[in-house]
Swiss-Prot record:
The gene is grin1. Residues 21-557, 646-810 are extracellular. Component of N-methyl-D-aspartate (NMDA) receptors (NMDARs) that function as heterotetrameric, ligand-gated cation channels with high calcium permeability and voltage-dependent block by Mg(2+). NMDARs participate in synaptic plasticity. Channel activation requires binding of the neurotransmitter L-glutamate to the GluN2 subunit, glycine binding to the GluN1 subunit, plus membrane depolarization to eliminate channel inhibition by Mg(2+). NMDARs mediate simultaneously the potasium efflux and the influx of calcium and sodium. It comes from the Eukaryota. This is Glutamate receptor ionotropic, NMDA 1. It comes from Xenopus laevis (African clawed frog).
């Protein structure tokens, strides 16, 4: 018996030990709920989760409390009642009082300190999406800002592109604004206006007046109940709740007191099961249970902290458990499909689309998380309308942006009284001018001042305004650019600048300028039919042939001229020598005649030059046969030289040499760029975009990018100043410039053919009428008249098509040569006269000297013959000769001085 008793005790002990080793792991889940009833629902949900995920390893246990009256008591309760029980997660509902938005905050702060996940059940404030504040907060409901997705889908459904966003300047309003702007940016659109106001503002009339002045009639409102009430009251005073308007709001804006003042026809949202705490408890417990079972399949799982007193260590497994929760997917929830985004907010949520009809909210559709499903109930819009409003009001006052680009838009300063000076076209008609505000390029700092605009595009604008019945105000683009996309603050985000940017940002309603139509721009704006067809061409400086004074010598090189001159003198010397030493150099017909003199060196020179210049030989020809043979050879040489010179002179002076211009876009100097040949275009223009996009032109683009100019006017001036060799731009502009500035010329065939169009936003109500009027203007000849008036292609140089003829410039050197000969002749005649006088004086002096010697000799002979006294007459004659000789010496000296002066 004793043995049996011991055996039974041993079996009982072993059974108890085995059972103790198989006890499941108790995992506590905490909750802070609004009522005791919801605590019971929470416990039942935990039991259901244990049954659904039955396992002997893990058993879930429910630990819950109700909300406390203040934040401190709530934080203490979380520490004492929940964290002390080592809870793995805490579920928290919204407090019963609708105005108490901060009760989940102490729970989130306390649990977040230890990295214990907190799952919100009905808390929708956007502040809980900020993970820098609420580290471990998740929720099974979306924030209020998530309603922006439904507004965006409604805009797409009803094709509304013009919206005004009115938000309160608090965290909730800014979150809704950011969400909607992000969605619109993906669609490459934006709100026409964002109006913010301080929460608690009672009179919002001034704010809504800004909205009333806009074309958009779709108003999206994000505000609290009280602020929404103030907006509705001010809108009713301004008659902004009637026909034509659309009001899209969220859930708060049609709740409580706001609903009493909301206008009939307003469309609001209600989150399906948004306030069903019981349903969210069931879904949250199911998600936590699923995540816990996934967590315990991992290794190194630590237990949560036990209590807050003296414990400052975070739960090491807490961040891991949060990541597991955020990656959880529960498709069969009571409230629908449950998933979390990177902020811990619920991704997919279902909304009822409510329409206020006769002061009652009526469901007219459902948003199922992806798209809107409309039911059979018709929407009653503001003003009792049943037809969908267009969402905008066509304004008859348009803001026109343009750019200085002659001949399409001329910009000139106004007169002292602020008006435009009266001018006339080439046809004698008054030029139509408009006042355009814009930066003045001639004043430092480029201040915005009123200026006068006129030209092709201004005439076109005036005609469109008259035909389509709208008024306008014109301004010049602030940055002086046509428009291209550029990165913002070195980020991947790109924005349009120039006229494109002003149009897309709402600063302008229409672009009336020579804006090139291309694919990049057409993706963002709407173009009219082209009002001017054109392409790209190349502008270069014209090589004007210039004649110098020595141009008549250009047919021969200087070496050849030197050899010809040397040959003349060599032949002359040889003729002289041959004729001098020839026995037949002195020729006579018969013996009675005197012999002719042989050829002198001077005559030989005269003969040699005469034959070369074909001046005719009157005398001084060679007499000997040998010299005459050389003379004939020299004549043949002269004939060949003169004929060659004459032929080449015509080529140099009459016929233009072919200029080495650019042949087109495929010219080797463009395709193989170098620093010796610089070409460029305008920065951030359609031409710049074209070269950037074309792979085969990438080499050219890299060269051009370093040299591009800010404006076409600067580049054209650079070509004229020889700072730029070629400028690539719109053919219409360059051909006009070449017709006005005669030192410029376009070259090569057109490429990248396109056209100029009027730019409008994609949703512009004017786009169809503008295109129709442009086509009509082409048909009735108005565009042709504008071409004749403004884009007038005139011939700069009448010689371009006239027969080539010699001008004074070509032959000026020859006339200078004649003038030089005349001057040289006058100079030499003075020398000859002086020389002749000197020679005559010398000869007379010698004659007197001989006469004096003869008299002296006669007297000497008389003395020797015995006469004591000379004859008185002879003595007087001798004295006279001596006196004359003395005066002759004086004159000789004076004449010598004169010759020196002349020389």
């Amino acid at each position: 018996m004793g043995t049996m008793r011991l055996f039974l005790l041993a079996v009982l002990f072993l059974f108890s030990f085995a059972r103790a080793g198989c006890d499941p792991k108790i995992v506590n889940i905490g909750a802070v709920l609004s009522t005791k009833k919801h605590e019971q629902i929470f416990r039942e949900a935990v039991n259901q989760a244990n049954k659904r995920h039955f396992t002997r390893k893990i058993q879930l246990n429910a630990t819950s409390v109700t909300h406390r009256p203040n934040a401190i008591q709530m934080a203490l309760s979380v520490c004492e009642d929940l964290i002390s029980s080592q809870v793995y997660a805490i579920l928290v509902s919204h407090p019963p009082a609708p105005t108490d938005h901060l009760t989940p905050t102490p729970i989130s702060y306390t649990a977040g300190f230890y990295r214990i996940p907190v799952i919100g059940l009905t808390t929708r404030m956007s502040i809980y999406s900020d993970k820098s504040i609420h580290l471990s907060f998740l929720r099974t409901v979306p924030p209020y800002s998530h309603q922006a997705l439904v507004w965006f889908e409604m805009m797409r459904l009803f094709n509304w592109n013009h919206v005004i966003l009115i938000v309160s300047d608090d965290h909730e309003g800014r979150a809704a604004q950011k969400k909607l702007e992000t969605l619109l940016e993906e669609k490459e659109s934006k709100a026409d206006k964002v109006l913010q106001f301080e929460p608690g503002t009672k009179n919002l009339t001034a704010l809504l007046l800004e909205a009333k002045e806009l074309e958009a009639r779709v108003i999206i409102l994000s505000a609290s109940e009280d602020d929404a009430t103030a907006v509705y009251k001010s809108a009713a005073m301004l008659d902004m709740t009637g026909a034509g308007y659309v009001w899209l709001v969220g859930e708060r804006e049609i709740s409580g007191s706001a609903l009493r003042y909301a206008p009939d026809g307003i469309i609001g949202l209600q989150l399906i099961n948004g306030k069903n705490e019981s349903a969210h408890i069931s879904d949250a417990v199911a998600v936590v249970a699923q995540a816990i079972h996934e967590l315990f399949e991992m290794e190194n799982i630590t237990d949560p902290p036990r209590g807050c007193v003296g414990n400052t260590n975070i739960w090491k497994t807490g961040p891991l458990f949060k990541r597991v929760l955020m990656s959880s997917k529960y498709p069969d929830g009571v409230t629908g499909r449950i998933e979390f985004n990177e902020d811990g907010d619920r991704k997919f949520a279902n909304y009822s689309i409510m329409n206020l009809q006769n002061r009652k909210l009526v469901q007219v559709g459902i948003f199922n998380g992806s798209y809107i499903i409309q039911n059979d109930r018709k929407i009653i819009w503001p003003g009792g309308e049943t037809e969908r409003p267009q969402g905008y009001q066509m304004s008859t006052r348009l803001k026109i942006v343009t750019i200085h680009q002659e001949p399409f838009v001329y910009v000139r300063p106004t007169t002292s009284d602020g008006t435009c000076r009266e001018e006339y076209t080439i046809n004698g008609d008054p030029i139509k001018k408009v006042i355009c505000n814009g930066p003045n390029e001639t004043i430092p700092g480029r201040p915005t001042v009123p200026q006068c605009c006129y030209g092709f595009c201004v005439d076109l604008l005036i005609k469109l305004a008259r035909e389509m019945n709208f008024t306008y105000e014109v301004h010049l683009v602030a940055d002086g650019k046509f428009g291209t996309q550029e990165r913002v603050n070195n980020s991947n985000k790109k924005e349009w600048n120039g006229m494109m940017g002003e149009l897309l940002s709402g600063q302008a309603d229409m672009i009336v300028a020579p804006l090139t139509i291309n694919n990049e721009r057409a993706q963002y704006i709407e173009f009219s039919k082209p009002f001017k067809y054109q392409g790209l061409t190349i502008l270069v400086k014209k090589e004007i042939p210039r004649s110098t004074l020595d141009s008549f010598m250009q047919p021969f090189q200087s070496t050849l001229w030197l050899l010809v001159g040397l040959s003349v003198h060599v032949v002359a010397v040889m003729l002289y020598l041959l004729d001098r030493f020839s026995p037949f150099g002195r020729f006579k017909v018969n013996s009675e005649e005197e012999e002719e003199d042989a050829l002198t060196l001077s005559s030989a020179m005269w003969f040699s030059w005469g034959v070369l210049l074909n001046s005719g030989i009157g005398e001084g020809a060679p007499r000997s046969f040998s010299a005459r043979i050389l003379g004939m050879v020299w004549a043949g040489f002269a004939m060949i030289i003169v004929a060659s010179y004459t032929a080449n002179l015509a080529a140099f002076l009459v016929l233009d040499r072919p200029e080495e211009r650019i042949t087109g876009i495929n010219d080797p100097r463009l395709r193989n760029p170098s620093d010796k040949f610089i070409y460029a275009t305008v920065k951030q223009s359609s031409v710049d975009i074209y070269f950037r996009r074309q792979v085969e032109l990438s080499t050219m683009y890299r060269h051009m990018e370093k040299h591009n100019y800010e404006s076409a006017a600067e580049a054209i001036q650079a070509v004229r100043d020889n700072k730029l060799h070629a400028f690539i731009w719109d053919s219409a502009v360059l051909e006009f410039e070449a017709s006005q500035k005669c030192d410029l010329v376009t070259t090569g065939e057109l490429f990248f053919r396109s056209g100029f169009g009027i730019g409008m936003r994609k949703d512009s109500p004017w786009k169809q009428n503008v295109s129709l009027n442009i086509l009509k203007s082409h048909e009735n000849g108005f565009m042709e008249e504008l071409d004749k008036t403004w884009v007038r292609y005139q011939e700069c140089d009448s010689r371009s098509n006239a027969p080539a003829t010699l001008t004074f410039e070509n032959m000026a050197g020859v006339f200078m040569l004649v003038a030089g000969g005349i001057v040289a002749g006058i100079f030499l005649i003075f020398i000859e006269i002086a020389y002749k006088r000197h020679k005559d004086a010398r000869r007379k002096q010698m004659q007197l000297a001989f006469a004096a010697v003869n008299v002296w000799r006669k007297n000497l002979q008389d003395r020797k013959s015995g006469r004591a006294e000379p004859d008185p007459k002879k003595k007087a004659s001798f004295r006279s000769i001596t006196s004359t000789l003395a005066s002759s010496f004086k004159r000789r000296r004076s004449s010598k001085d004169t010759v020196n002066v002349v020389v």
